[in-house]
Design a protein with these regions (language model features):
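Histidine/lysine/aspartate-rich catalytic loop segments that bind and position anionic ligands
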Residues: 127-133, 141-146
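Glycine-rich phosphate/pyrophosphate-binding loops
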Residues: 64, 136-140
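Second-shell loop/turn segments in exported
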Residues: 110-115
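Active-site nucleophilic cysteine motif
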Residues: 116-132
């Protein structure tokens, strides 16, 4: 566990039963956590970061992740969390049950325009599994690989942790 992650977990414990919130910022000195005050009218169910806290974090370096917690909740982003994450275009780190779950920002699964290697079939199910907390590696693939008799999805299943049952 990194020092940043330790600071995040300590902040989350201090905030219970309210949701904690803050930012992971990359500074010239390295990565650090900037805790924020949850100004939500219902802090035990939602979080809201004051614009001043957002600006304070941006002034310290590049914001690389927004962090919040689900005390007593589930270890994945809610529907509202996902909408806000997409608007923020940031990775979101979620603290739940003493663990940090890291969610990279992925676009909505429906309505995507097909682009090989960017928003293709593998990217779609890789993103869907990611939203469920399962990370799958990306792999290099040339366009039209399926026309040469290859099946990169099945060939790479073992690498992603899947196995035949």
């Amino acid at each position: 566990m990194t020092q940043t992650e330790s600071v995040i977990l300590a902040h989350t414990r201090r905030c219970v039963p309210a949701e904690s919130c803050g930012f992971v910022v990359r500074t010239p000195e390295g990565e650090r956590y900037i805790p924020c005050v949850n100004i939500s009218a219902e802090p035990e169910a939602y979080f809201r970061i004051a614009p001043e806290d957002w600006l304070r974090a941006e002034m310290q370096g590049e914001i690389v992740a927004l962090v919040h917690s689900h005390p007593g909740g589930l270890p994945w982003l809610s529907e509202a969390d996902r909408r806000l994450q997409i608007k923020s275009a940031l990775s979101w780190w979620l603290v739940c049950r003493g663990e940090i779950h890291k969610f990279r920002c992925v676009p909505h699964l429906t309505g995507r325009r097909f682009e090989h290697g960017v928003t293709d079939c593998y990217t779609l199910f890789r993103d869907a599994y990611h939203l469920a907390g399962i990370d799958m590696p990306d792999f290099e693939r040339e366009d039209d690989w399926w026309r040469n008799g290859q099946n990169l999805y099945l060939d790479n299943m073992a690498v992603t942790g899947f196995y035949r049952v």
